[in-house]
Structures are given as structure tokens and as C-alpha cells.
Amino acid sequence: MAAAANSGSSLPLFDCPTWAGKPPPGLHLDVVKGDKLIEKLIIDEKKYYLFGRNPDLCDFTIDHQSCSRVHAALVYHKHLKRVFLIDLNSTHGTFLGHIRLEPHKPQQIPIDSTVSFGASTRAYTLREKPQTLPSAVKGDEKMGGEDDELKGLLGLPEEETELDNLTEFNTAHNKRISTLTIEEGNLDIQRPKRKRKNSRVTFSEDDEIINPEDVDPSVGRFRNMVQTAVVPVKKKRVEGPGSLGLEESGSRRMQNFAFSGGLYGGLPPTHSEAGSQPHGIHGTALIGGLPMPYPNLAPDVDLTPVVPSAVNMNPAPNPAVYNPEAVNEPKKKKYAKEAWPGKKPTPSLLI
């Protein structure tokens, strides 16, 4: 085991001893500044870990001016099952509690002991993996309260300090897993190169008309507000050689309509009327496209005298059956029957 000096142009190196081995899972360091826990450093992956200011050579960087580039090494002894701390000839020294370690001499670090590097105020406490309680309660032991009983059943520690310690450990463990996953993924995945967008400016020779109503007078200014609706029209009847148009068939029907002759319906028209307007058959004339009847100026007179019918001034009385009960009864009013179209005749209820 040897360590190069931190001074000079040569790079500091650390030779791993033969007795170094992999530590048990869950071994970690609590980084505390004052009374506040800053983070947890998991140290169960490698045989040794380097501490110092140089982030390229050290596993854990100490950001303090009093620390050397490669300050110290933390090594796990595979036979003794203990952790040893080695000072790599640092300028301001490595401390176990308040005792400064000798350079290049391994010093055993007990569990729950605290170490510090240089003049840094951060203290590093060695911890094992937090122990969880069994899920079942042994014997007749009873928990004090409902919360403590629930924590015991879930396998969580009863005290708040132990619970916070377990939470911080799990957080640090998850961060390490996510970091390792990202680093391994970056080795296999090649990031595609970004294509630069064409930043050149081009001009189009074609003129683009935005408002056509300003150029074309046939385009209305409010064309966007106009709505067009198409209403289908019934097809007109096709006029064939054997069929008549609507207007002609209508006039034919009006001509064939039987008009009453009136007082002078049978006389022919005079010469002035015949020359001024056309007339049709049956004593009708076409006025405004419609047939109108002519008045009969000389109707036929019936010369046979009309004999009036004889009127009987003394009608014979109609015999009726005498009913003595009807005489004593009071007279009843008789109302007229109501009649309307479609009413069926019903027998009268009045006597």
C-alpha cells in the first residue's frame, strides 16, 4: 500500500491493499453539518472510496479549501469485517473524533463513530443499514398506542429519529439506483445530432393577394357574411305533341265551363262589340285571356198564362182524440229543435 504526495506535478495514486473486500449492503455515512443531516453516502459498492477536492479522482468530493485533492481513503477489511480509514498525507489532516490520524497508517473506524477532513465543519458518521422491526409482535408485548402498534405491524421503527434515518437511507439508495441507471443508459444510447434550421431569408416573386375585394370589383366586401341557400324547383311538365301546356289547358277548361246566360245570354254581340274584342263560342268573349258571358238582350217570353192554384179559405178541422188527463196538466213550453249539418234524426222527447 502506497500513496503519492499531493504536492508536485505527479498525479496522486492509491494502491488498494490485498485485504480489502466488498462491504456488507447498507453500509453508509451520515453527513451532518451542525445539527442538520445533509445527506447519506452509500459505501457498499466498492472495496475502497476516495475523499478529496478533485472530482475526477475522488468518489466523494469535499468542497473545502483546507482539503487536499486526494485527502483520504476508506477501506473495508474482508477478514476483520471492519472499516479502516487511511490518511493520504493530507496537508490539514484527517480526524477520528478529535484525534488526528497518522499518514499512510490504516485506522479502524467503529460503527457510529465520526470522522472529519481538514478544517471542514462537516462530520461523517459511519452507520449500518437501518434495522426494521418484524411484522408480528413477539410474546405478550403490547404497544403503547394505536400509532405505535400500526408502525410495529408495518415494520417501521417506533421512534421518530429512527424513522427519519430510515427515510433518508431509502432516499439515498433510490438516488444511487437512478444515477447508475442513467449512466449505464448513456453508454449504449447515442444521442441524435440536432439539425440546424435553415436561417436564410428567401423572397417570393409571386404576389399574394390578401384582400381580393380591394383588387377585383366583382368580389363583394361583405362576402363572408353572405349565406347562400339552394331551393329546388319542381320540374315543369314536358310539352309534347299530344299534351297541352298549363296555360292552354287552363284556358280550355274555362271555355268549356257552363256559364248562365243571364237576361241577355242568348243574343249575339253587336257589330261594335264584335269588332273590338274577340269572342268564343256559346256567346262568350275573351276578355284579358278569360272567357266572359254576354248578357242576353232579348230573352224569350212565355205567352202561356199562368193559372193560379185554388186556395181553400175554410180548412176542415183535424179530429183529435180527447184525453181528460191532458186537460188538467199544465201547459209545457215547446222549444225548437237544434239542427246542424250531419246531425242524425232522433225521435222527439216532447209530447
Curated annotation (Swiss-Prot):
Region called Involved in PP-1 inhibition, residue ranges: 191-200, 331-337
Residue numbers bearing the Phosphotyrosine modification: 264, 335
GO biological process: cell population proliferation; mRNA processing; RNA catabolic process; RNA splicing
Annotated spans, Interaction with EED: 143-224, 310-329
InterPro entries: Cell_Proc_Reg/RNA_Proc, FHA_dom, SMAD_FHA_dom_sf
Keyword Transit peptide: no
Placement of sequence motif Nuclear localization signal 1: 185-209
CDD domains with a match to the protein in the record: FHA_PPP1R8
Modified-residue entries (Phosphoserine), positions: 178, 199, 204, 249
SMART domains in UniProt: FHA (SM00240)
Quaternary structure note: Interacts with phosphorylated CDC5L, SF3B1 and MELK. Interacts with EED, in a nucleic acid-stimulated manner. Part of a complex consisting of PPP1R8, EED, HDAC2 and PP-1. Part of the spliceosome. Interacts with PPP1CA, PPP1CB and PPP1CC.
Name of the protein in its database record: Nuclear inhibitor of protein phosphatase 1
Organism of derivation: Homo sapiens (Human)
